[in-house]
Amino acid sequence: MLKKRKTRELAMQIMFLWDSAAQRDIDTAREYANNNTEDPEIRAAALQMAESAWEQRQMIDQRVEKIAPQWPPRRQPGVDRNLIRLAVWELTNTHTPPKVVIDEAIELSREFSTEQSPAFVNGVLDAVLKENRALVSEGTVKEE
C-alpha cells in the first residue's frame, strides 16, 4: 500500500514539474524520479501514471471546469490541479476503488498544498465520481 502512495506522490510531483515548465520533458522526469526513490518499480509506475494522466489533461481540465466553473484549472494551485488530473485519470482508467483514489488525493493535498485544498479536491473528485456513475447507469459508458 505504501508503494502505491509513493507512486502517486511521485507521479503528482512529475506532473507538477511538467505543468510548471508548460511542457512534458521525460528526461527531467526520469532524473527527478531517480533522485526521489531507489525503487525501480515505483519509478516506472510513477512515470507511466504521470505520462498517461498528462496526455489526458486537457480533457480532464474541461470536465473539472464544468464541475467548478468558479475555479477553472488555470486558477487552481498547481499541486491541486495536478492531483485532480492524476486522480481523475485513475478514477477513469484503473480498477482502484474510488474511495482509495479520493482519500489518497485528499491526503496528498493535505501534505503538499494549501489549508483549503483537501476540501476543494474532495469536492471536485466527488463530483467527478458521481458524474462517472451517472454515465455508467445511463449506459453512456460501460463499466468494466
Annotate each language-model stretch with its function.
Residues 1-144:
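N-terminal interaction/assembly modules
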